[in-house]
UniProtKB/Swiss-Prot annotation:
Heterodimer composed of a glutamine amidotransferase subunit (A) and a GMP-binding subunit (B). The keyword Thylakoid does not apply. PROSITE patterns: GATASE_TYPE_1. This is GMP synthase [glutamine-hydrolyzing] subunit A. Pathway: Purine metabolism; GMP biosynthesis; GMP from XMP (L-Gln route): step 1/1. Keywords: ATP-binding, Glutamine amidotransferase, GMP biosynthesis, Ligase, Nucleotide-binding, Purine biosynthesis. Coiled coil: none annotated. Catalyzes the synthesis of GMP from XMP. PANTHER family: GMP SYNTHASE [GLUTAMINE-HYDROLYZING] (PTHR11922:SF2), GMP SYNTHASE-RELATED (PTHR11922).
Length: 188
């Protein structure tokens, strides 16, 4: 299986590579200016974290809006990638009233896909100034925290996912399982 990782300069991206490789998948880093055709070789795509604000700096994300709209493969957005997916597909993203940094407890409401087998609460690593306040039409909220209503989301066909937190960071409990569950969706 081949995974594309769209890279926005996030500080934890090497950990995404490490986790996906550990789980036995091939992964390739893709700069966001590549034509959408070059991403059609991947079985799934992960949109990484990064320092940008999607509502103010979308141009810095290159062709990523086209990737989200045109690729017909499973997708996972992490932090900035989560916000990008929501924004491009019609959700609402804004500056967080209470930015989250460090360990945060989330409440899981729906665990049937990327959060499969998880308990109702999970400690996760956060690092964000912006947040998704309303997911796109056709998406459901999988998890929330005291400060961010949309900590995880999925579309109705369980093929596009977003998580506000960083599953790649060791401080996130069971983070490797989120990648494992996502790769399971990619293999279907």
């Amino acid at each position: 299986m081949k995974v594309g990782l769209v890279y926005y300069g996030g500080q934890y991206n090497h950990l995404i590579l490490k986790n996906v490789k550990y789980l036995g998948a091939d992964i390739e880093v893709i700069p966001p200016h590549k034509p959408v055709e070059e991403l059609k070789k991947f079985d799934c795509v992960i949109f990484s974290g990064g320092p940008y604000s999607v509502s103010e700096e979308i141009q810095k994300m290159g062709n990523s809006p086209l990737y989200i709209k045109e690729l017909k493969v499973p997708m996972l957005g992490i932090c900035l990638g989560h916000q990008l997916i929501a924004y491009v597909l019609g959700g609402v993203v804004r500056r967080a009233l209470n930015p989250e940094y460090g360990l945060t407890r989330i409440n899981i409401f729906d665990e049937d896909t990327i959060l499969k087998g998880f308990s109702q609460q999970l400690n996760v690593w956060e690092s964000h100034n912006d947040e998704v306040v309303e997911p796109p039409s056709g998406f459901r909220v999988l998890a929330s925290s005291a400060n961010a209503r949309v900590q995880a989301m999925a579309n109705s066909s369980n093929s596009i996912f977003g998580v506000q937190f960083h599953p790649e960071v060791k401080h996130t409990e069971r983070g490797i399982e989120i990648f494992k569950n996502f790769l399971g969706v990619c293999r279907k």
